[in-house]
């Protein structure tokens, strides 16, 4: 994946997060600022998803800690084989929001 594809992929992922949260009536607000995507919950807690362009990685920070994901076999996966969508679902649940992502 080149840098342009990386940014396009992440932008599509961020769009999908917003759409899926909306579709599930989640009590969360999404905000994009440059390379950072923030999900803020009613209690003001946050999940932060950011682009790491030099590494072509996607990082996720939440109450559960921080995870790094690389693009492998058409999916964002961390070093332990956890899919980004599964980690995001778990992170949202840790913030009190019962949602699931594809």
UniProtKB/Swiss-Prot annotation:
Pfam families: Frataxin_Cyay (PF01491)
Annotated signal sequence range: none
Keywords: Iron, Metal-binding
Lineage top rank: taxon: Bacteria
One GO molecular-function entry: ferric iron binding
SUPFAM superfamilies: Frataxin/Nqo15-like
SS bonds (residue pairs): none
Cellular component annotations (GO), alphabetically ordered: cytosol
Keyword Metal-binding: yes
GO biological processes: iron-sulfur cluster assembly
Annotated family: Belongs to the frataxin family.
Task performed by this protein: Involved in iron-sulfur (Fe-S) cluster assembly. May act as a regulator of Fe-S biogenesis.
Protein name: Iron-sulfur cluster assembly protein CyaY
